[in-house]
């Protein structure tokens, strides 16, 4: 089992003046601690509720993850997950290719249909109806495959037309950076995972009660994914199974043994890669504890 880290907020003490140094410290610590992956969100407004108000500090995802890639050497990097309709697919694939080249082959393409209408409308970005967002997502996945195999013939879809999809340089990671699709809709999202993706990302929860409730749901979603793979002739084991969860590793909150047990339970239902976000990530100590007491133990889980 591998452990990843997602950074979800930027309202730390001293923000925004110290955001650059704090983010660099988080990234280098995670890299040295043995985290397998490092992610930021693709949001332009904060998400509300426990995450903070819409006008809380929020950094653009690809600028931020490129900054963090430049300060690390081993950890894989990505955006969890890209809102597909926020960028034209040709530009998105060029962006991820550039990230992969500059990071030495460490990029993921994390992607989803997009859901946060307020930020899209607020900044004047397109936000079509749900069915169209999924149709556009599928075309983007096709374009990614098209460009990353070096096919320069035109791509003509219902929504996107690329007359000369040159992509040079190609990513260092061959045949391409891994494509990770976020979401767990059984009819559309998981079918797209089976057809196009190298990884799925499911959401577990943020509390012990949500973890207990989420485990059987995760197991069910993976069963549905297996069924889609069988229908499409895809080898299920080729797909990296990841989950996203929130933990607060600190006195009075979750402890090391609880997180280790959570990882063990996730491994038992077929999860290979757990991506955690932590409200106290800027304090650094929790990352060091992960590196010393959690990552070495869960590495043996399969």
Predicted regions and their residues:
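Hydrophobic faces of well-ordered beta-strands that scaffold small-molecule active sites
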Residues: 3-7, 38-40, 76-79, 107-111, ...
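Short, acidic/polar
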Residues: 17-30, 92-95, 183-195, 253-266
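An alpha-helical appendage that flanks or caps ligand/catalytic pockets
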Residues: 7, 31, 36, 131-173, ...
């Amino acid at each position: 089992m591998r452990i990843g880290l997602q950074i979800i907020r930027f309202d730390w003490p001293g923000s925004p003046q110290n955001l650059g140094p704090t983010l660099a410290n988080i990234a280098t610590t995670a890299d040295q601690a043995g985290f397998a992956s490092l992610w930021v969100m693709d949001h332009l407004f904060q998400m509300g509720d426990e995450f903070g108000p819409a006008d809380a500090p929020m950094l653009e995802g690809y600028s931020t993850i490129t900054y963090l890639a430049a300060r690390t050497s081993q950890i894989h990097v990505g955006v969890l997950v890209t809102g597909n309709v926020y960028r034209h697919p040709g530009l998105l694939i060029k962006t991820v290719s550039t990230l992969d080249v500059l990071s030495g082959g460490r990029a993921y393409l994390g992607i989803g249909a997009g859901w946060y209408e307020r930020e899209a409308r607020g900044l004047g970005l397109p936000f079509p109806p749900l069915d169209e967002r999924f149709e556009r997502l599928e075309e983007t996945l096709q374009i990614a495959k098209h460009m990353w195999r070096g096919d320069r013939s035109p791509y003509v879809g219902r929504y996107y037309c690329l007359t000369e999809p040159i992509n040079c340089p190609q990513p260092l990671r061959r045949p391409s950076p891994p494509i990770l699709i976020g979401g767990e809709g059984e009819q559309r999202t998981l079918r797209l995972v089976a057809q196009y993706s190298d990884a799925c990302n499911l959401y577990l929860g943020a509390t012990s009660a949500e973890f207990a409730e989420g485990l059987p749901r995760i197991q069910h979603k993976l069963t549905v994914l297996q069924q889609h793979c069988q229908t499409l002739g895809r080898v299920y084991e080729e797909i990296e199974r990841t989950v996203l969860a929130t933990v607060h590793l600190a006195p009075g909150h979750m402890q090391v043994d609880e997180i280790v047990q959570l990882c063990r339970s996730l491994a038992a239902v077929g999860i290979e890669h757990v991506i955690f976000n932590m409200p106290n990530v800027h304090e650094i100590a929790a990352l060091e504890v992960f590196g010393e007491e959690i990552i070495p133990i869960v590495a043996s889980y399969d």
